[in-house]
Every structure is written in structure tokens, then in C-alpha cells.
Amino acid sequence: VEYYPGTEAPADYISHIRILRPGQGADSSSCSRTVSMNRILSEQGFRFYQSSFDEDKQGSWLTVNHDPWGIGITYVGYILLGISMIGILFSRKGEFRRLMNHPLLKKGGVLCLLLLAGNMQVQGRTLPVLNIRQADSLASEQVIYHDRVVPFNTPARDFVMKLTGRASYAGLTPEQVIGGWLLRPEVWRYEPMIYIKNRELCRLLNLKTSYASVTDLFDGQRYRLQDFWQGGRETGRKMSPLEKAIVETDEKVGLILMLQKGTLIRPLPKDGSVKPLSLSKVRAELIYNRIPFSKCLFMFNLTVGLLAFFHLVYCGLRHSSERSALSRRINRLFVAVLYAAFLFQLLGYGLRWYVGGRIPLSNGYETMQFMALCTLLLACLFRRRFPFTVPFGFLLSGFALLVAHLGQMNPQITPLMPVLVSPWLSMHVSLIMMSYALFAFMMLNGILALCIRRHGKMLMLLSRLLLYPANFFLGAGIFMGAVWANVSWGRYWAWDPKEVWALITFLVYGMAFHLKSLPAFRRPLFFHIYMIAAFLTVLMTYFGVNYILGGMHSYANA
């Protein structure tokens, strides 16, 4: 097992094997080969995949696949599907080109852009903490945390956030708080800073507020949480809210114990075996930690999006001749704010990419960030021809960031699992999230059409136009995921819930292409209602699978 330098996080699983080729006398031969994650060994039509290994790491488990013809045939099918989808988009006689040239939509730019896509002092309630100058200098010191070299500010911020639910505590910086715990734990253990949101657990612990100290959770040598535990982690048994709160509180206590034992944060080894971060990366991570990009942007985008949506409905209910110069100035203001929001989100996403050293698409938090970025980009591209994409961009990006915030998706930057280190994964996730963003636009487009009936036909044409790249992005993302699965595990399809629901989504939206066979889709009202209802399959694919069905693709808690 190869590890990331200075950490215990696996970077790759590698097996060294010797192949014996049977023969007679001098004709027999052998050779040494290597198998690892996403690196297949092919020998005489057999493909060997790294699967697992023994606990003592003395033996390796390999998956063997023999399908000499199937891979070529399958890949040719994927290529033909991709060529046909591109052909539909660029065919001069195709429906997509006809929709682009429709008089109701021909009012602005070209939609081909769719494809671009310690010294101690006493402060605050006599708590012993570092002075602010020492704390600030400590913030940029490099340590190993969660199997990654980071500035000290990162574990300090995560520690305070995990315990209190906030980025700071009692007016103290995260470095001051964690410094106090490291230097004077006998004082800080009496400080009520462990946030417990479950009222029943607070009552059982005799707490007057929603915050407990470490001493509140111990009665001498007895750990009080054990008295309330009912075994909610038994297989097949769902935990009650009280048991979930006990587990969450226990994790917070464990975090404090890990800090005191020295296992939560480790200094860089002095032998130089771990390469420190560059000064630019340290500064970038400090900026990323100190600016709450997601929290600021979801509140801002939802607020501005609602204002822009109400303004859009107000203008839509009036005739063009009645629209004032003030309305046009307000529209230009919303557009300027849209570009600013996009650049702010791009800055946050780019910083995360630069700090992590990889494209941020490995967990639920990062994919929602990418979806928010995609919706803002699409709104910027379409806003000249379709002004209503401006409020849509604000609202969709705001909801995406809100879901990431409320769902408590893990915002920590961690090394990638070996199986995720693949360019196929990045393309797979990027295409699918682009399709989800377009489907979300179509859903809001349907809602707007129900509010402003007289624009129903034009909005239906727009949704039909977006349907082509949206469903094609989803289809391309599905078969790129199949290629990635074949490279990693030796199979294209495993009937995992996420795979099945992605296929269901692809088929549900695919029905809307068949206007001749299904004449109901020619009626704007039916079409818009169908697009709104179809978006439920997207929600099920992304959120329902993560939180309800589970499976290999589930990263609700990632």
C-alpha cells in the first residue's frame, strides 16, 4: 500500500505478481508485472484488477475478467452513441437546429455556447488563551491533519466548528481556542462549548443550555453517555434521534481526546520526508478558510434571486411598451450582480481546487459547489437572449449551496481514495452535474410558464431546446461512468441504485423528445408540468439515493 507522504491515507494499492508462461524446457518463461487501482494487467485475453488484500498485507486479491470481444464492442457502441448525439446537435435539418432558429427564440446570441461548458494571557471569561499575535503567527504553521499537510488554521477551524457549530467561540479565534485546549486542558474541560441540539439529551444531562462541558459528560470515571445508549448501531436497526445525538456528542468528545493525545494534529517530520506546502498554497488555504464562500453566497443568491424573480413576473405581466427605463436599469443591475456572484463562486471553487491539488468533485459538498458554478455560468451565457435565466441562475445556485450547507456535507479537503484518482471520474461527474443544472433550469422554466401563461409556448420551445444538451450530457456521463467502472472494477454496470436512477432519469426525459408518437408533449401546459414532475427523478437520483437507498455511489456523509 502506497501512502500519501507523511500520512496514513492510502494513495494506491499495488500488487507485484510473477507470471509463469508454461512451456517445455527453455521455452518456459516468467515475468514480473504490477497491478494497481485504475491500472489493469492484461495477459492472454485475461484482465486482472486490484480488488483487495489480506489484513496482514501479505496477500492480494485480484478480480479476473475474460471478455476479449465485449470490451471493443461496448466501447464502439459508446462511441457511436456519442457521435449520434453530437450529430443531432449539429445537424442542419435536425430538430435542435430548427428550435434554435425559431422566431420566438431568435432574439439574441447563439446557443452553441451551451457546449462550453507559549506565552499565555487571560481573555474572555478568564479562559487561558494565546494572545492574538501569537495565535495569528500560529495560523500559518504547517501540520499534518486528516492525512494532508495543512496550515494550523485548518484543524483549528474544524475543531471549533465541530464542537460549537460556529467558526469562532466567545470572541476568540480558532487558534486561540485550540491553543488553550493544548496548553491548559484542565481549565478548558469546564468550559461549556460542546453544542448539543437534542433537547432530550440536554434534559438527561441536566443542562440549562444547549452547551455542555467535558465535565458535564463524566461523573467521576463514569462516562455518562453510556447510561443513555440503547445500542442503536446494531445491524439493521435505525437509530433514534436521541441515539444520533449521543453518537454526535461522543464524536466531539473523541475529538478532544484525540487532540490531547496528539493524534489529531501531528507536526511535520524533521527528516524532510514530507514536503511542506509552498507559501502561496498556505496563503490560499488561509483565504479559503477565512471567507465563508458557500454561506455568504447561498444567502446572497437566494435573496437576490427572489427579488429578480418577482421583478421578472412583474415585467412579464406588463406589455413591452409599458416597461420603464427604471426596469431596464434594474435588469442591468441584476446582470452585473450575476457576474459578480459567478466570479465569487469561481474564486472559492478555484481556491479549493488549488489547495487540494485536484478537481473538487469527490464528494457531495464539492459536487453541489460545481453545480452552483454551472448554473451561474449558464445564466451568464444565456442572459442576453433569455433574461429570465438571471433569476433562475441566482435561485438554483443558491439552493445548491443551501443544500450543501444544511445537509452538513463534509467541507474538509482530504486526499482522494485510490479508486477516485481517474480522469474518467472527473468527466463523468462534470457532465452529469451539467445535465442536472440544465434540468433544474427547465424545471424553473416550467414554473415560470405556469405563472405567465401568455409566454407558455416560447418557454416550452426553450425547454425543448435545453432538453437536447441536458439529456445528452446525462447520457454521456453515464457511459463515461461505465468506462471508469470497467477500468476500476472490470464491469460496466452493477445495478447500483445510483446507476439505476440515472438511467430512469435519462429515459424519463427522453420521452419528451417523441412529440410525434406522444402528442401530449405538443401542448405547452402538459409539457411544463411534465418537466416539473420529471425533476423529481433528478432529486431522487442525487439526494434520495444518497440518504435513503445507499449504495456504492452514496456520499451523503462524505
Predicted features along the sequence, with ranges:
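Solvent-exposed, non-transmembrane regions of integral membrane proteins
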Residues: 1-558
